Design a protein with these regions (language model features):
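Active-site neighborhood of phospho(di)ester-bond hydrolases with catalytic His/Asp-centered motifs
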Residues: 6-7, 44-48, 78-85, 107-109, ...
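N-terminal active-site segment of His-dependent metallophosphoesterases
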Residues: 1-69, 76
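Metal-dependent catalytic neighborhoods of phosphoester/phosphodiester hydrolases
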Residues: 50-67, 83-102, 108
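Divalent metal-dependent hydrolysis catalytic cores, especially in the metallo-beta-lactamase
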Residues: 43, 69, 80-86, 131-138
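Conserved catalytic scaffold of divalent metal-dependent phosphoesterases
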Residues: 94-195
Length: 202
């Protein structure tokens, strides 16, 4: 299975007072979509931070809608999307159950997750564990695991919950959006937040 992994599109990014939507549209429409078509991609992954903020401008939402439609409806390629720390999980989850049969798998709110996304190729099933960014308190409440107090414990709980639904021997891909310990700050316009964890479960 040929999987194209992407992340951090940050659609609707405002850079020194200017929206980058036109530039982002060029990259997605003139580079990403032809790559999906020409390279025989079997599945596209967007691992979080679809938008630059939880309430994105309308132009950014329209761009994502257009690109997602072209990937799934025109190119007939499954598109798996999870929310990141910049996204609104509730907004990203909108109509997710309706869209999944069309090949657009949106994982935002934990309450709406039903388990791994399973795709097929000539070698059989591939299970995708879709793990959106979630604070430990949200994971603790949704999974009913009172012991979850840290981001590492939250990730381990989510991976354990989804992974337990995958039969032995099935190829598995983890799609997650999370902080990683040991990050180094750069001269970006916003300070980086380096909080978190490494996990044996990952």
């Amino acid at each position: 299975m040929r999987i194209l992994h992407t992340a951090d599109w940050h659609l609707g990014k405002l850079f020194y007072g200017n929206y980058l939507t036109e530039d982002q549209a060029y990259v997605l429409e003139q580079q990403l979509l032809p790559m999906i078509r020409d390279e025989g991609i079997d599945a596209v992954v967007l691992a979080g931070d679809v938008y630059d903020r939880s309430l994105p401008p309308a132009e950014a939402v329209e761009l994502f809608d257009d690109v997602a439609t072209r990937i799934t409806a025109d190119l007939h390629v499954p598109f798996l999307v999870i929310s990141g720390n910049h996204d609104s999980p509730a907004r990203l989850s909108f109509a997710s159950r309706l869209l999944a049969p069309q090949g657009l798998y949106m994982a935002g709110e934990l309450e709406r997750l039903t388990g791994p996304v399973v795709l097929e190729d000539d070698a059989g099933p591939v299970a995708f564990l879709t793990v959106p960014y979630a604070e430990p308190a949200v994971v603790r409440q949704c999974l009913g695991q009172d012991e979850v107090r840290s981001h590492q414990q939250a990730m381990e709980a989510l991976l354990g919950w989804q992974g337990s639904q995958v039969p032995d021997g099935v190829r598995t891909v983890c799609v997650a959006h999370a902080f990683v310990a040991g990050g180094v700050a750069s001269d970006s316009e916003r300070p980086l937040s380096c909080l978190l964890y490494t996990s044996d479960a990952a």
